[in-house]
Amino acid sequence: MAGKKEFSVFMHELVPEHRVISEEEKEELLRRYRIRLSQLPQIKASDPAVVELGAKPGDVIEIKRKSPTAGVYLYYRLVVED
């Protein structure tokens, strides 16, 4: 079955929730932490989660991670070309 998606990476219990943030959210993130876009950790456009989200280079991904000590925390990554 070439070309047919058979599995979603987000269905796996170890893969945290991902989403592409809006331009307004991106500007607020940069302002809140007083950083430049280039200072964010990077994630490649070929990453399976990024591909499934349909994100493109320049987008920022918000990752919601669960921690036994911190509860839930947000992590941000900049999508870059391979």
Curated annotation (Swiss-Prot):
Annotated compartments: Cytoplasm
Parts forming coiled coils: none
One matching Pfam family: RNA_pol_Rpb5_C
PROSITE patterns in UniProt: RNA_POL_H_23KD
Keyword Kinase: no
GO molecular function terms attached to this record: DNA binding; DNA-directed RNA polymerase activity
Catalytic activity: RNA(n) + a ribonucleoside 5'-triphosphate = RNA(n+1) + diphosphate
EC identifiers of the protein: 2.7.7.6
Keywords in alphabetical order: Cytoplasm, DNA-directed RNA polymerase, Nucleotidyltransferase, Transcription, Transferase
Biological process (GO), any one: transcription by RNA polymerase II
InterPro entries: Arch_Rpo5/euc_Rpb5, RNA_pol_subH/Rpb5_C, RNA_pol_subH/Rpb5_CS, RPB5-like_sf
KW Cell inner membrane (keyword) present: no
GO cellular component: cytoplasm; DNA-directed RNA polymerase complex
Gene3D superfamilies per record: RPB5-like RNA polymerase subunit
Function field: DNA-dependent RNA polymerase (RNAP) catalyzes the transcription of DNA into RNA using the four ribonucleoside triphosphates as substrates.
Complex and partners: Part of the RNA polymerase complex.
Family: Belongs to the archaeal Rpo5/eukaryotic RPB5 RNA polymerase subunit family.
Designated name of the protein: DNA-directed RNA polymerase subunit Rpo5
Protein source organism: Thermococcus gammatolerans (strain DSM 15229 / JCM 11827 / EJ3)
Organism phylogeny: Archaea, Methanobacteriati, Methanobacteriota, Thermococci, Thermococcales
